[in-house]
């Protein structure tokens, strides 16, 4: 039976779904190779799990679909989904410890959301200027 693992990662309103299966070590994000996806900053953010454990995806093809949110929110959702998939694929507690020691949000969703705007102001906490005379 073919080994396939599905994982997901979330950040703000971005949701990334990753599928890992045996292959040649190709990583695709929204059908685009990771080497040509987005800007350099987003590629570096997504590649963090790969830098921590260099041979983690050798022999694994990773397909990630991400939607919602902004550029960096999507990048952080993708890196969470990728790191979770790598840990599940190898089933190695040492890998999990390396990721948790580096950054907890590699394996745990960052559930912080934007605070909603309130009336009588321009944002969540800021109020319109008041004049007394």
Where are these regions (language model features)?
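Structured, basic alpha/beta domains of bacterial-type, RNA-associated proteins
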Residues: 2-9, 16-21, 25-67, 83-133
């Amino acid at each position: 039976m073919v080994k396939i693992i599905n994982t997901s990662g979330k950040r703000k309103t971005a949701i990334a779904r990753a599928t890992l299966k045996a292959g040649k070590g190709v990583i695709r994000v929204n059908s685009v190779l990771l080497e040509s996806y987005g800007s350099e900053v987003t590629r570096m953010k997504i590649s963090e799990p790969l830098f921590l454990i260099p041979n983690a995806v050798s022999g694994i093809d990773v397909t990630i679909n991400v939607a919602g949110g902004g550029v960096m929110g999507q990048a952080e959702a993708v890196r969470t989904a990728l790191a979770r998939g790598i840990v599940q694929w190898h089933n190695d507690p040492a890998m999990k410890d390396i990721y948790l020691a580096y950054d907890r949000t590699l394996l745990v969703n960052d559930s912080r959301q934007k605070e909603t705007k309130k009336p009588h102001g321009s944002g969540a906490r800021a109020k319109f200027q008041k004049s007394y005379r």
